[in-house]
Structure formats: C-alpha cells, structure tokens
C-alpha cells in the first residue's frame, strides 16, 4: 500500500510518500513544492500541476491531508484552505480517495501528545521512519507525519 501525506500551503507544500512492503514501512519520497511570490492563482496552478505529476508518478492508494485548522490569522487560514482545495481537486481528478485528519490527531499519533510542538513532531517522525535527521523544510516533515498518521488511522501498521 502506498500513501501520500500532504501539508498544504501557498508558498510551500510538503509531500511525503510512504509505502508498506513486506510488512515494513518505507519512505519512498519526500519533497517540497515551492512557488515564487507571484499572484495567488498562479501559485495554485503551479501547486496543482506539480502535485498532479506526483500523483500520476507515485500512484498512491490514498492521499492524507490535515483538516483546516482555523487560527487567529484568518488570511493564512484562507490561503491554506485554497491550497487544500487544490489537493482535493488533484486527488479527485486522479480518482484517489482522501483521508482528512485533524492536526491534533496527527500529533497524538506521532508524538503521543496532541499539542506537541513542531520540533517534537519533526524529531519523532525522523525516529519512527528511521531517518538520520528530520526532513527540511518542516512542511516536508509534517507531510511525512500526516502520511504516517494516515497509515495508523487506517490500521496499515497493525
């Protein structure tokens, strides 16, 4: 089973690909989709095109993305929501189901504490996946954490 975790944003989208083979969880790929500081609709187009390429290449059984966390910064929440829409559209156009997880669920699964700081999530995901150091930027570590949490949520590692 192959799963892609996505941490959406308009400047950086973290992508993490995990695959279960012979009872082992393997990190297949991780990367950041970055966009230059241009008009938002052009950024979203770049995100869509690059994500669509990744979905076609990797052929995951499922995409996992965090539900929108509404913070005090409404502008940021709206931008993340727009990027999430691109993720959902790319997944739908490729007939890939989407699992949405709450940020607190991801943190609880990865660290054991739903309000863990970002640094703890990065540290734990590196340890859990056998990486020497946490992937950078942190959006990529978050994407791997989202994919890992998706596996556990679906019973993929049991």
Swiss-Prot record:
Enzyme class: hydrolase
Residues binding Mg(2+) 1: 7, 139
Reactions accelerated catalytically: Endonucleolytic cleavage at a junction such as a reciprocal single-stranded crossover between two homologous DNA duplexes (Holliday junction)
A Pfam family the protein falls into: RuvC
Cofactor: how bound: Binds 2 Mg(2+) ion per subunit.
Cofactor: Mg(2+)
GO cellular component: cytoplasm; Holliday junction resolvase complex
Catalytic machinery residues: 7, 66, 139
Chain sites annotated for binding Mg(2+) 2: 66
Keywords: Cytoplasm, DNA damage, DNA recombination, DNA repair, DNA-binding, Endonuclease, Hydrolase, Magnesium, Metal-binding, Nuclease
Keyword Hydrolase: yes
Gene3D superfamilies in the record: Ribonuclease H-like superfamily/Ribonuclease H
UniProt entry tagged with the keyword Metal-binding: yes
Annotated GO MF terms: crossover junction DNA endonuclease activity; DNA binding; magnesium ion binding
GO biological process: DNA recombination; DNA repair
EC number: 3.1.21.10
InterPro entries: RNaseH-like_sf, RNaseH_sf, X-over_junc_endoDNase_Mg_BS, X-over_junc_endoDNase_RuvC
CDD domains the record matches: RuvC
Subcellular localization: Cytoplasm
Family membership: Belongs to the RuvC family.
Role played: The RuvA-RuvB-RuvC complex processes Holliday junction (HJ) DNA during genetic recombination and DNA repair. Endonuclease that resolves HJ intermediates. Cleaves cruciform DNA by making single-stranded nicks across the HJ at symmetrical positions within the homologous arms, yielding a 5'-phosphate and a 3'-hydroxyl group; requires a central core of homology in the junction. The consensus cleavage sequence is 5'-(A/T)TT(C/G)-3'. Cleavage occurs on the 3'-side of the TT dinucleotide at the point of strand exchange.
Oligomeric and partner information: Homodimer which binds Holliday junction (HJ) DNA. The HJ becomes 2-fold symmetrical on binding to RuvC with unstacked arms; it has a different conformation from HJ DNA in complex with RuvA. In the full resolvosome a probable DNA-RuvA(4)-RuvB(12)-RuvC(2) complex forms which resolves the HJ.
Protein name per the record: Crossover junction endodeoxyribonuclease RuvC
Originating species: Carboxydothermus hydrogenoformans (strain ATCC BAA-161 / DSM 6008 / Z-2901)
